[in-house]
């Protein structure tokens, strides 16, 4: 299946493809286009839009697109993914929903990746996914230790 979103990816538009590829659609293909072209291209390519306004897999209230995907594809049964969703939310939004302490750190790392000069959004995603692999491992460890809000919960 094809999945489409806005170009010049930031936190949620890197986290969502990682989540989709690992837990929803192992054969996923990702398309990144100008914001004003997403819906037209989604229709033309028969692609699923995500992290754009007014779509099912977008922001709703203070929840980010990663969380919409968790809910839609019933991934909320995995408490480590739920914790990762809170961290992504904290990095992608004003962090007022969960006040997840790890969120600002992820935001800083993601911003750093944007300044490393990757040739396009595909290359940036490929490079940055290791961060999400590591964060997921961290979240699994926090769950095993009973720290469902992460190590640095307030």
Task: Explain the meaning of each model-derived region.
Residues 8, 59-60, 115, 122:
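Histidine (H) residue identity feature
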